[in-house]
Swiss-Prot record:
Pathway: Purine metabolism; GMP biosynthesis; GMP from XMP (L-Gln route): step 1/1
Organism of this sequence: Burkholderia cenocepacia (strain ATCC BAA-245 / DSM 16553 / LMG 16656 / NCTC 13227 / J2315 / CF5610)
UniProt KW Signal keyword: no
GO MF entries: ATP binding; GMP synthase activity
GO (cellular component) term, any one: cytosol
Protein name as it appears in the record: GMP synthase [glutamine-hydrolyzing]
Assembly, per entry: Homodimer.
Length: 539
């Protein structure tokens, strides 16, 4: 049985980052809404509780409080931002509006040598004070400490930026240790979880396989399972894990909608049929998908058509497998949280995710989601431990509608064929080019990145087909062909992103190869837009 950390979500947009930092310390945790019942908290039996931030104010919403059971359990509690403020209010302190709201970078002084912050610092002042570079985002502030608490940290604008009652194991910080902008944030969360809470660091993917396999076998018994295999990381790892558990009781359905990457179908079939000896039904439905997309230019309409047709094709194949009683999906933990699918109804729906609803009820199947407790990085670790090749497990994200949202405007087979080849060349150049000391000296990458491929140094890279033509010259003749844009970004969370500063030589080779090898494209441009204001995908 794993030790567990309970994260109570008060509505912060970065609560998932708290969970990721805890998991990175190899400790299991779950996110639940702040208004879970006292019985739920007691039954969860956490080693510690973390209270998240919130957009709310302690003045405006007196319902946003931690359950009383949190304070009755006798376990350590860490409050972050709003979590600090509700801790103060609930335990007898005072919170008030701040005349100097803090949003962004701040330098914070640590006080009192508490267990949480002792010896954790970014620099020391001339007076010998330990300082931390942190990220603030608050309009209220704690004005009066609760009984039993001592000052732990301060900034010029926030005299009480941290507080601690070490006898009870209660700590609170006004900054956000979960975000990368707080330089020592990961170290702070790790210290709370491992040293203060004493949680065992035994949440390791290699060991998780045995537990997951046993759970799948217990759920499924001798019944059969059907899974939609897309070639993406999540469905591939889910398929490999379920196949490890129940073998031929699993049938994978791979639908080719005509909008896959170059040779993607062959790679998936070689992997699952060839290496894993799994049962795979391959459906070429490209004519059906492309036929329904003809004349459609609106991005959202294209997404809906592709989603609708996938469901139709998958349903038709599923009905042929009359013995199947389970539908398996590659749902991962962020999907569950973002869809309001945590174990209570409080979670706010940020987006409706395709993996969390729909098909099981339509088909009358039970739902099997073996990855629903894992973050993406954990899914990748699990895939490697299951023996999937790194080039499959560490592939860049690929949208569900495939090339359909990387072809601007109407989708045609001709456009998809051109884009597939251009995209493959760009990815090949990224994989085949390693960062050099000269790249590091020019500020394109860090010194630690020298020797890594530029594919691994970018978070997502792809080509986009633009349905416009431009004049060119090839040989002695005039050309009038299509334009493609290359896009590469670097990000830690995909919520914001910077365009990747790739070496000019790499971009030049990719451009030359695309223009020379892909007949029909005579101009290549590079997208240098960040997110925001642009999104990563063009549609």
């Amino acid at each position: 049985m794993h030790d567990k950390i309970l994260i109570l979500d008060f509505g912060s947009q970065v609560t998932q980052l708290i969970a990721r930092r805890v998991r990175e310390a190899h400790v299991y945790c779950e996110i639940h809404p702040n208004d879970v019942s006292d019985d739920f908290v007691r039954e969860f039996a956490p080693k510690a509780v973390i209270l998240s931030g919130s957009h709310a104010s302690t003045y405006e919403d007196h319902q946003l409080r931690a359950p009383q059971a949190v304070w009755d359990l006798g376990v350590p509690v860490l409050g972050i931002c709003y979590g600090m403020q509700t801790m103060a209010v609930q335990l007898g302190g005072k919170v008030e509006w701040s005349d100097h709201r803090e949003f962004g970078y701040a330098e914070m002084r640590a006080h009192g040598h508490t267990r949480l912050l002792d010896d954790i610092e970014d620099f020391t002042t001339a007076e010998g004070h330990g300082m931390l570079k942190v990220w603030m985002s608050h309009g209220d502030k704690v004005a009066e400490l609760p009984p039993g608490f001592a000052l732990m940290a301060s900034t010029p604008s926030c005299p009480i930026a941290g507080m601690a009652d070490e006898a009870r194991g209660y700590y609170a910080v006004q900054f956000h240790p979960e975000v990368t902008h707080t330089v020592k944030g990961r170290q702070i969360i790790e210290r709370f979880v491992l040293q203060i809470a004493g949680a065992k660091p035994d949440w390791i993917m290699k060991n998780h396989i045995e537990e997951a396999v046993a759970k799948i076998r217990e759920q499924v018994g001798d019944e059969e399972v059907i899974l939609g295999l897309s070639g993406g990381v999540d469905s591939s790892v889910a398929a490999a894990l379920i196949h490890r558990a129940i073998g031929d009781q699993l049938t994978c359905v791979f639908v080719d909608h005509g909008l896959l990457r170059l040779n993607e179908g062959k790679m998936v079939l070689d992997m699952f049929e060839g290496r894993l000896h799994a049962k795979v039904v391959h459906v070429d439905a490209s004519d059906q998908f492309l036929g329904h997309l003809a004349g459609v230019t609106d991005p959202e309409a294209k997404r809906k058509i592709i989603g609708r047709e996938f469901v139709e094709v998958f349903q038709a194949e599923a009905k042929k497998l009359s013995k199947a009683k389970w539908l398996a999906q590659g749902t991962i933990y962020p999907d569950v949280v973002e869809s309001g699918g945590t174990k209570t109804k409080k979670a706010t729906t940020i987006k409706s995710h395709h993996n969390v609803g729909g098909l099981p009820e339509t088909l009358g199947l039970k739902l099997l989601e073996p990855l629903r407790d894992l973050f993406k990085d954990e899914v990748r670790e699990l895939g490697v431990a299951l023996g999937l090749p790194p080039e499959m497990v560490y592939r860049h994200p690929f949208p569900g509608p495939g090339l359909g949202v990387r072809i601007l405007g109407e989708v045609k087979r001709e456009y998809a064929d051109l884009l597939r080849r251009a995209d493959a060349i760009f990815i090949e150049e990224l994989r085949g080019t390693t960062a050099t000391a000269q790249d590091a000296a020019a500020g394109l990458c860090g010194e630690a990145d020298v020797g890594k491929s530029w594919y691994d140094l970018t978070s997502q890279a792809f080509a986009v087909f633009l349905p416009v033509k431009s004049v060119g010259v090839m040989g002695d003749g005039r050309t009038y062909d299509y334009v493609t844009s290359l896009r590469a970004v670097q990000t830690t969370d995909f919520m914001t992103a910077h365009w990747a500063h790739l070496p000019y030589a790499l971009l030049g080779r990719a451009s030359n190869r695309i223009i020379n090898e892909v007949r029909g494209i005579n101009r290549v441009v590079y997208d240098i837009s960040g997110k925001p204001p642009a999104t990563i995908e063009w549609e």
